Amino acid sequence: MIKFEKVSRFADSDIEMPRRKTAESAGYDMVVAEDIVIPPYDSLYDSMAVNAATTDKPLTLNEVALITKSLKAKPTLVSTGMKCQLNKGTYLELSVRSSCPLKHWLILANGVGIIDSDYADNPDNEGEIFFQLINLSPVPIILHKGDVIGQGIFKPYFKTDLDEAIEIRMGGFGSTNA
């Protein structure tokens, strides 16, 4: 069964469940669970640039991750307060509203979000669905509880005939170290 549920920290909240607005809408509108400020991109860029300027060689992914972690310079995680139970062979694709970049200068940092069928109920974050946002404007932007931030679209996926993946998910974001 495919269904959205509130995560426990928002169980008593009056946030809207994701829903489609029209009969032919592919995506379920996802709302912001709590007020949050998205800092401007230049503040992230400036803090990264200062640390990266100490070297003239390209940085590895691990080096960038260490700088990012030490500076707490990363995209803003915007909670929907939701998790999603999915059938095997299905994933939930997240994208920002088409108006976000055009009208509000907000983009999804990872281009598209993928919620795997084994993400719900993981021990790190209960499978809470977040949008990773970057604010390209020169000023902070506040998102209010209930603002529609993006869409979730259910999609099937396929595996190769010789697929041998047997690991069990043990965490949330980045838990597979990919």
Residue ranges with predicted function:
Residues 1-178:
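DUTPase catalytic domain/fold
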